[in-house]
Amino acid sequence: MEGKVAAMPELDGVTHRWMNIRGIRLHIAEAGSGDPLVLLHGFPQNWWEWHGVMPLLATHYRVIAPDQRGFGWSDAPQGRYSAGLLVEDVIGLMAKLGISRARFLTHDWGAIVGQLLAMQRPDLVEALIVTGAPDVHIRPNARLVLVFPKLWHAFALAVPFIGPRIQRSRKVMQHLFTAFEPAGGVSEADMNLYNAAAAKPARARAGSALYRGTILPAFLKIIFGVYGRRDFTVPTLVLIGSMEPSATLQRMCHRRGRGGNVTTEIVPGEGHFIADHRPELVSGRAMEFFRTPRAA
């Protein structure tokens, strides 16, 4: 078994525990009380992505920020990291915590998991916020190829042996943290924390497996309109920075799909890691969106 990842960063008001979920140990950071709000981080991050928003959201909600399989302080087992497996992890976590329905704030591949959960089990999702990822129901057009050069890392990370080496490269990861960001989007200290955890061999292999098993397949399904043919009824806010590729996708493509209540907001001058750079904006929009009265 791989040794300790790193010392757990401390955040006032946040408690930590590990739970056995479907055969692996997942780390969960928790704060506050009230209705449950689950935060799903992105690549190559962990629960610490939410350290700026958790204290603000915890004044109104029971905030639950797991390290998803293969990341942070959770187990990083070998094998496939398919979308179905990751969705089942979230369902298992909710069952273990005794949560029958929750709000979700998600980022990057965590936003893919959140949207798939909302499609498969809408009974579990009260409302959903997507950051750092497109609405999977958009209808791409031929101009989509213009975005491909910006996504080179997704294809490279998915390649066995090469992908893990990329994830362990501080120089490459530094580029990914700054390529689509305003100056100071992610602090040097936070980048170091994320990189220290993600560079461990088991987690580097997990990251590559994630791109092969979930992220690239999801991208292809978006291209071919697979998700757009499915019912989608969960109230959803897509909140993305104008500097990131997801914003380009949203501008190029028309939304399609049956049903649904999806609102898109593109934030000028912000990038991919919007929760790191503007936690007050993200938490403020989250509380406003989650409090919006909805028809029964």
Feature annotation, model-predicted:
Residues 2-17, 24-26, 36, 64, ...:
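Flexible "cap/lid" subdomain of the alpha/beta-hydrolase fold that forms the substrate-access gate
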Residues 27-73:
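Conserved HGGG/HGGXW glycine-rich cap/lid loop of the alpha/beta-hydrolase fold
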